[in-house]
Every structure is written in structure tokens, then in C-alpha cells.
């Protein structure tokens, strides 16, 4: 009797333990999204980033790095491409001279206005939803936060609303404060800067380093704010996500695992670091976190609160369906579908959540 009761309790514990751990969501590639050809026979360059609005419209940042020979009768797509949930083009817009050649990230606010980060410039810009009006610019045109104001100057990380190679942006829904990951590449700034909705500098902080990892170049490559008051930053070169509170107090590291891609397959392990960009699942608790792991060329699915890796998917580097070539942007819509934008692959792929 005692042994039977012990076995029963053991079985109940196992069942409880299995249920206590989050089960990873499953996805299937949507072969019919987006609609091809896109727009008026458009050809895109590298897709530097993407974002999704509350109506599940997808905005692609087209870097237009296309040579005339690539066009072959096609037309160069505009810098900003808006797609509806069916994968059809709603509109395209954007002045490449204003946005620059390295548009890198975007964020859509609740009213539909869209923030765009031009990594090669010293500013970020806010546009009306249709792109017809630039509503705000933070940072002075032609000026960098450097010792001499130029691209060649030494980075300052100064207490002002000016940037030097900004990488990503997100907005606090409660306060309207703008969080900028400022420092996409070596030679630029390396900080998280917080700006008021009026464009006034509020505070900043660096990526967290200890004596053991002080030699790793701090490059904040992405930034996303969670519903529970935390700030998630891609510490790209250190292969991890760093988590802070809204005031910049360090909370913890979430390290990424990866299987290096060999040089023969066109990718040197550690060349850029694995933590590139992330997104959260659409539930209020944001149970899952999706991270582009650029070293393994996979999408990592993690349990957000614990940082535990649940699964990864992707069929390795390549240009076939379900493969990725330098994935650089990720988004999740209200239904839980995943979107992966590729810089060298020059496309976006959609993965539907399997019920």
C-alpha cells in the first residue's frame, strides 16, 4: 500500500513537472505570403528591419542596395513597404536621402505613427502612418554624437538627444518615453538612451560588463520593452540578451546557444555575434521570446521569464523556402504568426502558429 501511494505521488509529481514547463509553440511556413510579385513589379534590396502595427500590417525597411543590373525590367521598391495581413502591398513610401542607406529598425505606436531608425545617421524619425509627413526628428541632421560631430570623431555617449549609429527603438506605452539602442557598429556610441516624447534627453546607461567580459565590445543591437516593466537589449557580440529595469538597473543575462556555421558554408562563427533582434509573443504575459540567432542561422524560442531555450527552427543558411540568409528583423502579429526579414536574402517569410 505504501509503495503504491509512493508511486502515485511520483507520477503526480512528474505530470506536474511536465505541465510546469512551457511547451514551445509550433509553426508552419506560409507558402503564400507575401503576394508575388510585390507592388508594381518591385524588387527589394536587403530588408534591414521590420515592425507590425495593431492591425497586423507589416512594415518592411528596404535598404535599396540594388545595382541596375539586378533590376532586369523590375522597379526598385521604395524604402518603406506596408503589407496587409493577406500579404498584399498597401503602400510604399520614403525619401532615401532622408532615411539613409542603413535603415535598421522601426516601431509603430498605437496611433499608427511609425518611428524609423537610420543606423548610418545621427537621428531617428517619426512619420505619419502613410509616410506623408515627418512628425518629429530626434537628433540633428549631419551631426553625430562624436568628438567633432562627424562620423570620423570619437564617440561621446553624451547626455543629449543626439546619436551615433543608432540601432533600434521602442516606446513605453505608459509614458511615451522613447528608448534607443545607440551603437550598431564599433566606432559609434554604446548605450541605451531614453528620450521624452517631446524629444528631451532623460537618462542613459551602458551595457553591463564585469571584469571577466570587459574585453567584449558592447554593441546594443536591439531593444524591446516588455509588459512587466523590463528592457531587453541584444548584447550582440557577447551572444546574449541583457535585461534591465526602466531605470537601467541590470537584472540578468540570457545567454544564447548556437552551433557555429563553418566558413565553408559562408559564415564565420562569432563574426557578428548571435543576438541580433527579438520579439515577444502577443499574450499579456509575453510567455515566449523569439530571438534571431545569427551565428546558428536559426530562430530561438525561449521561455521569457526563465530564459530557457525551448526549441529552435530554421533549415540552415540558404535561399530556399524555410532557410535564412542573414536574418535581421523579426515580428509577431496578434495571432502569434512570426515574420522573419532577411538582409542578404532580400525577403520576408511568414510562419503561422499551429493550433
Could you describe each region identified by the protein language model?
Residues 1-10:
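Bacterial N-terminal signal peptides that target proteins for export
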Residues 23-355:
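Eukaryotic scaffold repeat domains enriched in small/polar residues
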Residues 11-14, 325-326:
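CBM-like carbohydrate-recognition segments
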Residues 3, 21-22:
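Intrinsically disordered, low-complexity regions enriched for glutamine and histidine
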Residues 17-19:
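N-terminal signal peptide c-region/cleavage motif recognized by signal peptidases
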